[in-house]
Curated annotation (Swiss-Prot):
Protein name according to UniProt: Large ribosomal subunit protein uL2
Keyword annotations from UniProtKB, A to Z: Ribonucleoprotein, Ribosomal protein, RNA-binding, rRNA-binding
Gene Ontology MF terms in the entry: rRNA binding; structural constituent of ribosome; transferase activity
UniProt-listed NCBIfam families: rplB_bact (TIGR01171)
Function: One of the primary rRNA binding proteins. Required for association of the 30S and 50S subunits to form the 70S ribosome, for tRNA binding and peptide bond formation. It has been suggested to have peptidyltransferase activity; this is somewhat controversial. Makes several contacts with the 16S rRNA in the 70S ribosome.
Amino acid sequence: MAIKSYKPTSAGRRHQTCSTFEEITSTTPEKSLLVKIKKTGGRNHFGRVTARHQGGGHKQKYRMIDFRRDKRGIPAKVATIEYDPNRSARIALLHYTDGEKRYILAPLDLKVGDTVLSGPEADIKPGNSLPLRSIPLGTIIHNIELKIGKGAQLARSAGTFAQLMSKEGKYSQVKLPSGEVRLVLQDCYATIGQVGNIDHENVCLGKAGRSRWLGKRPKVRGVAMNPVDHPHGGGEGRTSGGRHPVTPWGIPTKGYKTRTNKTSDRFIVKKRTK
């Protein structure tokens, strides 16, 4: 994948960059793996906003992705590499030898015509899914399960990867993209390689409208609001807010720790570094 830029024919074009999509081999998704999505605009069933700055955006259909990789021992051929509007990574359509079709996240260097396999006996090559106990130490992995059979939850966005650090007893130590080192059960499955579309982080949207296409609404500053809307609101003329930064609900922000302790914290060997 590469990034293309544009001639500055307008202010919005000046810094805009876009993917060349050269790795995409099909623009038509597999119909049997599509599901309708109803937009919520960030509202819950009461109609109240529970997730701010969401709404609008281009109409999309959800692609059913196989995060469980539970079709063990049956080889599959990569038919297409496709764009997915619901995630930053590209997806690959697999045709299994028994006739079934599934989507998976497309790892780096996976190409049309390649064969992938899921199971303890699979080779160590991009796209193959194995339990952590069958993966050599130091291997780059992604799409990692936290609970056996639940499906992958870690290292799924474009360009991300984790690394298998060590094995001890029934747990493996995995270094996550954040720098956190975590214990994961050795029977949990992970996929070999790094998630593709690694240049995604270098894309510059260039204009507000492109964010709106993605369903992102403007984030209004608290100091620009009225006192009824935000603790920083009001005042004559421009103000600094007059207090340490807080959320719209009065909770300190910008560095204030709000994360509560969980029982799963005992599986964190080393806290994240970024």
